[in-house]
């Protein structure tokens, strides 16, 4: 489907093995290709490592924000539980 739409728009999507996913350098026929996550090709180990570090930083940031959201959510639930109002009859002797 993607090729149909890219052809329809008048531009073809380049094959993922034609250029480096990071620096966009052309990957030659007889050159080494460094792969990452199965569908990302890189011209050098340095470009590949830079992408890995970038992805790991994004993942750490996502995990940190996810933990923060869970913590805020549980604190809100705890504070709501602490403000419970009980109704009923009070008997004083």
From Swiss-Prot:
A zinc finger (FLZ-type) spans 15-59. Transmembrane segments: none annotated. The lineage of its organism: Eukaryota, Viridiplantae, Streptophyta, Embryophyta, Tracheophyta. This is FCS-Like Zinc finger 3. It is found in: Nucleus; Cytoplasm. GO terms for cellular component: cytoplasm; cytosol; nucleus. It comes from Arabidopsis thaliana. Induction: Down-regulated in response to mild as well as prolonged energy depletion. InterPro entries: FLZ1/2/3 (IPR044533), Zf-FLZ_dom (IPR007650). Residues 54-93 are annotated as: Disordered. Belongs to the FLZ family. May act as an adapter to facilitate the interaction of SnRK1 complex with effector proteins, conferring tissue- and stimulus-type specific differences in the SnRK1 regulation pathway. Its main location: nucleus.
